[in-house]
Amino acid sequence: MEAPPPSSDPYKFLNITLNSDGSLTRHRDFPKLPPTEQSKDIPLNQTNNTFIRIFKPRNIPPESKLPILVYFHGGGFILYSAASAPFHESCTKMADRLQTIILSVEYRLAPEHRLPAAYEDAVEAILWLRDQARGPINGGDCDTWLKDGVDFSKCYVMGSSSGGNIVYNVALRVVDTDLSPVKIQGLIMNQAFFGGVEPSDSESRLKDDKICPLPATHLLWSLCLPDGVDRDHVYSNPIKSSGPQEKDKMGRFPSTLINGYGGDPLVDRQRHVAEMLKGRGVHVETRFDKDGFHACELFDGNKAKALYETVEAFMKSCSSTGPSSNSNM
């Protein structure tokens, strides 16, 4: 007898149980790692138990002013943490490879905290960074790792999977906010998690994918979206559901990098988002690798290296040209 496809029981596939009170029991998780000499945790909102894990490169040239990368981890909005081993290790490597200070954000998870909770936490992290930058100007204080060693005018916002979705949605929320002296030079959406009621071609073709089977992604959306809405909600399907206000705001996004892989069921959604942003006048760079699967950079060192190289080149191009002329960020 053949083994059932990975999508036959999405709860079992995701190793979760939905409890009667609406909370989740998460049966298996990545181990959580404590901060190291090159990282530390800063409380963000103690009521919400959110924090920022800051990573710095091992070898920082003297008198250098490093760029800042705000990072949002993946996990379908319901799993994992900024302290989860794969994301901690990835941020450690990125800080070294990119010579960048990385702020990895611990945001609230669904279904205990449905969207837009994660977006609100993301905005709070961006505003925290702004307040840190303004501290010395206003006679206040600034975190010691940020005070003298960063260039607040070279900030990037990056996320993977659900974190990529957060990047898009936090950009909508802060595009009209005065963040000075912080300047967001670019957005980086890596394998961003978007959806819709009607399956895309890649979702249909890869419906039994071993990483993102279609029934599992449907379950993720049912657990994270606001009660009573479907997958065409604007949080998951901005192409179908964005109104005039969202379209106007996305037209003021800074330069944006969208990265994806041909073996990811979500890849068509990512392509569609890229085209949507281009249609609003955003400078969009895309890298879609024929090979690879969802989250492959967490398991394949060569894919991780290629991703870091792509991100590094994008950051350098943003720094040399400056932010998009249509961006207020």
From Swiss-Prot:
Q: What does this protein do?
A: Carboxylesterase acting on esters with varying acyl chain length.
What's a Gene Ontology MF term here?
carboxylesterase activity
Protein name listed in UniProt: Probable carboxylesterase 8
The record's section on Pfam families has: Abhydrolase_3 (PF07859)
Tissues expressing this chain = Expressed in leaves, stems, flowers and siliques.
Q: Which gene encodes it?
A: CXE8
Its keywords, alphabetically, are: Hydrolase, Serine esterase
Q: Which organism is it from?
A: Arabidopsis thaliana
What InterPro entries is this protein classified in? AB_hydrolase_3 (IPR013094), AB_hydrolase_fold (IPR029058), Carboxylest/Gibb_receptor (IPR050466), Lipase_GDXG_HIS_AS (IPR002168)
**EC number(s) for this protein?**
3.1.1.1
Q: Which residues form the active site?
A: 161, 264, 294
Q: What is the lineage of its organism?
A: Eukaryota, Viridiplantae, Streptophyta, Embryophyta, Tracheophyta
Say which domain of life the source belongs to: Eukaryota
